[in-house]
Curated annotation (Swiss-Prot):
Composition skew (Low complexity), residue ranges: 729-747
The organism of origin for this protein: Symbiobacterium thermophilum (strain DSM 24528 / JCM 14929 / IAM 14863 / T)
Names of required cofactors: Mg(2+)
Major site of localization recorded for this protein: cytoplasm
Alphabetically ordered keywords of this record: Cytoplasm, Magnesium, Metal-binding, Nucleotidyltransferase, RNA-binding, Transferase
One of the Pfam families matching this protein, by short name: RNase_PH
Name of the protein in its database record: Polyribonucleotide nucleotidyltransferase
GO aspect biological process, one term: RNA processing
SUPFAM superfamilies given in the database record: Eukaryotic type KH-domain (KH-domain type I), Nucleic acid-binding proteins, Polynucleotide phosphorylase/guanosine pentaphosphate synthase (PNPase/GPSI), domain 3, Ribonuclease PH domain 2-like, Ribosomal protein S5 domain 2-like
Keyword Ligase attached: no
Function in brief: Involved in mRNA degradation. Catalyzes the phosphorolysis of single-stranded polyribonucleotides processively in the 3'- to 5'-direction.
Annotated catalysed reactions: RNA(n+1) + phosphate = RNA(n) + a ribonucleoside 5'-diphosphate
């Protein structure tokens, strides 16, 4: 295991009204304080870590919620823009719906605490983490997780914690706890580990193709800090300021009813559940449930909810027994067998890239769209990032599972699954310097029977390669499961779990990566934790499954396409002096808008992005239009030279000649003797203000003044086409120069998050 000193619990300080407890995490002090703020909550803890401050509260309702068959737990992260010294950027200038980041942070806290409430507990519990101050070097998501655990532990709500959580980074070959912002930039992984004193409960990771063994070591390294530092500190809080746990009413059917349900349903459910088809299996199980309800209705009146609960319990026991004792899964597969896989690309004609991935009865259609750098997502949250160049969005419509429900936009599950696939793919996305496009991939789940997030990873890889995105390596993903018998210690690790195995199993362990290593990992335990042995087996078994799936994908498309879709924009990159930017834009955008209008083809316009350093990106579906825009910009920024011919506009008349604007902000003088090859008595006899004339540069004197001639340009005037812009009579680019496409690295482009003076087009 790479070296690193696990931190230890610190000291406690009390006053008349507050109690605070400190510990060292990552070489910095974290303080948990209670008794001063939000005292009417069941439990309240203020977490201080560096300059970051998070208030965590937990409240439990007095009575169970009626009519539910689940534990109604809600975890919310409340981002406050004042925490980073900013005013919200929306029209109302106040916080609105939770951002995607806040939802992901809430899920990080929800997942490890949910398994630790009593079975049958139906009281509402709400955990709220309010971010009051943000220091980028001290992660508020971890503070919220620890604070929520502490608030629940010291409250009167029944909770079988505490849990703790840390971020583990890999910097210069060393594991680092809660890395600073600078360390995170250099880290090979971003691993969140949560667990109890005895076991790991939750893992969430993004990594740059890290080997499985290194990932396992990092998980266990983080758990050591949780076990030896965080848990003792929270337990000390509980011992000194914790409230006695309340007596609650648990949803618990009477023993005689349970016995009757077992006798009536066990054999029938054993037969009904063994069916490879999801819908047929669900219908058979539902039929058994209806029959048992009817048979027991007279003996146990008004017990429908208890019977339904017990039927699920018996079904769970039967599925788990068959897996552990017989090695047989509900659809008849072996423990390591992967469902049949089908892959296809180019299903859609106009989108820039599309890929279909089907594994058993899970089917995902992924679509890739390429945009300009001006299409990057503008972020308005508490993070340091300002823009986002690669996006993956996940949609899970109700028809994918044969259900109906209102379509209200992405929920927490969709946002979480989309972020997981995005994290898996991000390490292989080419940098902006190599591929100056914004990339958006959307995964449409068309059928679902488990592991749709990992199917999204596979489908997105197909779509990216079909679109011609030069990804570093293909990425595949697989979901692993676990069934463990706590009495005997026997367990089975399942490859490619389906929906029923996810619902009735003990673990959902998703692993995505390349042939080289892991790029994303997510694990959730539904029991009190897992051991190193099981984690190692799951990781190694997942690698075997991932390689099998990748082989099927590469048989469909072996590498990224060399050419982009004809409907994708081609990007021409050019560089001008920053001092010339105003010449290209013009007053109020007049010049650049004129370029866009004059290069329009049908309803399609070029898009022009100008960066602060003078880098210009011209995006055009029509190559000729993009090339014309490039030539016009080059003409605008090129300094006049003797012999060059321009079409300009007369701006002033003097007795000795006329001033002509040949470029935005650049005027030259046509002396009266140069107005015509005949004698001119008055300047007004030849030109007037506003006239368009063709002129030739005859001289640029030592003071930079430009002398022009209409007379010398007259032989060429018939061939010119006055347009108020430089004529294309200057040297043209040689064949091969200025062609669109990805520019080479080192072209002086700005980094992400540096918006230029303007983006125009579309």
């Amino acid at each position: 295991m790479p070296p690193g000193a696990p931190d230890g619990p610190g000291h406690r300080r009390r006053t008349n009204v507050t109690a605070s407890f400190s510990m060292e995490l990552g070489g910095r002090t974290m303080t948990l304080e209670t008794g001063r703020l939000a005292k009417q909550a069941s439990g309240s803890v203020l977490v201080n870590y560096g300059d970051s401050v998070v208030l965590c509260t937990a409240v439990g309702s007095a009575t169970p919620r009626e009519g539910v068959d689940f534990f109604p737990l809600t975890v919310d992260y409340e981002e406050r823009m004042y925490s980073v010294g900013r005013i919200p950027g929306n029209w109302f200038r106040r916080e609105g719906r939770p951002t995607s980041k806040a939802i992901l942070w809430a899920r990080l806290t929800d997942r490890p605490i949910r398994p630790l409430f009593p079975e049958g507990f139906r009281n509402d519990v709400q955990v709220v983490c309010t971010v009051l101050s943000v220091d980028p070097d001290h992660p508020v998501e971890i503070m919220g997780m620890i604070g929520a655990s502490a608030a629940l532990t010291i409250s009167d709500i029944p909770f079988e914690g505490p849990i703790g959580g840390v971020i583990v980074g890999l910097v210069d070959g060393q594991f680092v706890i809660n890395p600073t912002a600078e360390q995170q930039e250099r880290s090979e992984m971003h691993l969140v580990v949560a667990g109890t004193e005895h076991a790991v409960l939750m893992v969430e990771a993004g990594a740059k193709e890290v080997p499985e063994q290194t990932m396992l070591d990092a998980i266990l390294f983080g758990h050591e800090v949780i076990k030896n530092t965080i848990i003792p500190t929270i337990k000390q809080m509980q011992a000194e300021v914790g409230k006695p746990k309340r007596e609650v009413v648990l949803f618990n059917p009477p023993p005689e009813l349970e016995q009757a349900v077992r006798e009536a349903a066990t054999v029938r459910l054993r037969e009904a559940v063994r069916n490879p088809d999801k819908l047929a299996r669900e219908e058979a199980v539902a039929a058994v449930g209806e029959a048992v309800q009817a048979e027991l209705a007279e003996q146990f009146p008004e017990s429908e909810k208890h019977i339904a609960y017990l039927l699920k319990k018996v079904l769970k026991e039967e599925v788990r027994r068959a897996i552990i004792e017989e090695g047989i899964r509900p659809d008849g597969r072996s423990l390591t067998e992967i469902r049949p896989i089908e892959c296809a690309v180019d299903l859609l004609p106009r989108p820039h890239g599309s890929g279909l991935f089907q594994r058993g009865q899970t089917q995902v259609l992924s679509i890739c769209t390429l945009g300009t750098l001006g299409d990057m997502q503008k972020l308005d949250d508490l993070t340091l990032e300002e823009t986002k160049r690669f996006m993956h969005h996940y949609n899970f419509p109700p028809y994918s599972v044969g259900e109906t429900r209102p379509l209200r936009g992405p929920g927490r599950r969709e946002i979480g699954h989309g972020a997981l696939a995005e994290r898996a793919l991000e390490p292989v996305i080419p940098p902006e310097e190599e591929f100056p496009y914004t990339i958006r991939v959307v995964s449409e789940v068309l059928e679902s029977n488990g592991s749709s997030s990992m199917a999204s990873v596979c489908g997105s890889t197909l779509a990216l390669m079909a679109a011609g995105v030069p990804i570093k390596a293909p990425v595949a993903g697989v979901a692993m499961g676990l069934v463990e018998d706590p009495e005997t210690g026997r367990y089975a690790v399942l490859t490619d779990i389906q929906g029923i195995e996810d619902a009735l199993g003990d673990m959902d362990f998703k692993v995505a990566g390349t042939k080289k290593g892991v790029t994303a990992l997510q694990m959730d335990m539904k029991i009190s934790g897992t051991s190193r042995e099981i984690l190692e087996k799951a990781l190694m078994q997942a690698r075997e499954g991932r390689m099998f799936i990748m082989e099927k994908m590469l048989a469909c498309i072996s590498e990224p396409r060399k050419e982009l879709s004809p409907w994708a924009p081609r990007i021409i990159t050019m560089k001008i002096s920053p001092e010339k930017i105003r010449d290209v834009i013009g007053k109020g955008g007049s010049t650049i808008n004129k370029i866009i209008e004059e290069t329009k083809v049908g309803h399609t316009k070029v898009e022009i992005d100008i960066q602060d350093d003078g880098t210009i990106y011209i995006a055009a579906v029509n190559l000729e239009a993009g090339e014309r825009a490039r030539q016009m910009i080059e003409a605008l920024v090129k300094d006049p030279e003797p012999g060059m011919i321009y079409t300009g506009r007369v701006t002033r008349l003097m007795q000795f000649g006329a001033f002509v604007e040949i470029l935005p902000g650049k005027e030259g003088l046509v002396h009266i003797s140069e107005l015509s090859d005949k004698r001119v008595a008055r300047v007004e006899d030849v030109v007037n203000i506003g006239d368009e004339v063709t002129v030739k540069v005859t001289e640029i004197d030592r003071l930079g003044r430009i002398n022009l001639s209409i007379k010398d340009a007259m032989p060429k005037q018939a061939a010119s086409q006055p347009s108020g812009r430089p004529e294309a009579r200057q040297p043209q680019p040689k064949p091969g120069q200025g062609k669109p496409g990805p520019a080479k690295a080192g072209a002086g482009r700005p980094g992400p998050g540096k918006p230029g003076p303007g983006r125009h087009g579309r």
